Amino acid sequence: MAIMKTTLTLALLLSLPALAGPKEELSKPLTTIVNSVRYGRDNAALKLFAAEEQGKLLVADSWAKGTDAQRKEFQDLFLTLFGKIAFPKIRKNFENLDTILYDEPAVDGAKASIASTILINHPLKKQELKVKYQLVKQGSAWRVVDVAVLGDSMLIGIRDDQVQPILKEGGWDALLKAMRDKAAELKDVQLK
């Protein structure tokens, strides 16, 4: 009887991850990104971004006009540039990370959003950041599409201030050239 009871208890405990609710399922990749960036595992963090969905949002109507090769190069360059530019700044902010509190997510099929409050316990001042994430389900995994800090969307800012003006001026060729040039400029910044 004791063996049967122990077996049932173990079976229930081992099945708990499979019973994780939407909040846990959606916050897991976010926590992985934060910890990966915080501890210098940049490439692990970049794998949790939905590069194609980001490209569609950034390039907007021009996405369909690009060739498969152009879209692929854009995705690769964007993730590389994002990691090299944003991650060092984020890493610095997360040196004093205290905790992240996630709200209940809003899930609509393969799309979801979840808000969080990031508490930074800096010795000189405590800081509270309100962050909202847009995610998309790819296969069985959730990937991050966009992040809004204090209501400002990262991708919309990049799209409106950088990507769209270059596209309007010179199309895909000019955009990819500008991205290649910026990547060359940042060649000494290593993704970890």
Positions of predicted regions on the chain:
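Surface-exposed, charged secondary-structure patches
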Residues: 75-79, 83-130, 179-192
